[in-house]
Amino acid sequence: MLHLETPHLVLELVDPHSPPYDLLTVFNSNPDFLEATRGEALSAFDLPDVKTFIQTATSHAYNRCLAIRLRETGALIGAVVVVAPHTGQPYPWLGLLILDSAWQGRGLGAEAVQAIEEGLTQEGWTEVHLCVLEASSRARAFWERQGYTVYGERRDREGRACWLLRKSLVMGEPQHG
């Protein structure tokens, strides 16, 4: 899953050495994401934050950070991190999906998720998991609309409360609740 295409999007590996300016714009365009991750509404990400994100998201062979670009113009509008498999677990995780707020609500996030799920299915994965910060109820609602179900709660590395969600990638298999 190094390159995925949809009718409106191209998802491709992020070059860990490329300047992070476009991703900085994407991150800072999302006040809900800022508040959920920073714990305060007005705290913005800076270039070192985004460089650290890219370094972390590309540092292991099983981590894939994909840029989400508009197919028509090539403009960067988001990113997604796929960890397949997640350390010590027999299934992949989506570590982050973020779209520039100007492009939200147009079905592009769902289109990106569908492409990622199809890519994971082609690689032989049968389910995918993710974690949503409890401070981000909009994100949980988005994932539930994509067919993900909550199966638990935990704290992340920073001690923030999270919902655990999963989805079967096998057609006709019931979702676990």
Label for each model-derived stretch:
Residues L4-Q104, V113-A115, G119, R154-D156, ...:
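Acetyl-CoA-dependent GNAT
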Residues G107:
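Conserved G/P- and acidic residue-centered "switch" motifs that form tight phosphate/ATP-binding loops
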Residues A110:
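Residues forming the Rossmann-fold NAD(P)(H) cofactor-binding site
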Residues Q122-C131:
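Conserved GNAT acetyl-CoA-binding A-motif
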Residues L130-R140, D156-A161:
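Conserved beta-strand-loop-alpha-helix junction that forms the acyl-donor binding cleft
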Residues E144-E153:
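Conserved acetyl-CoA-binding loop of GNAT-fold acetyltransferases
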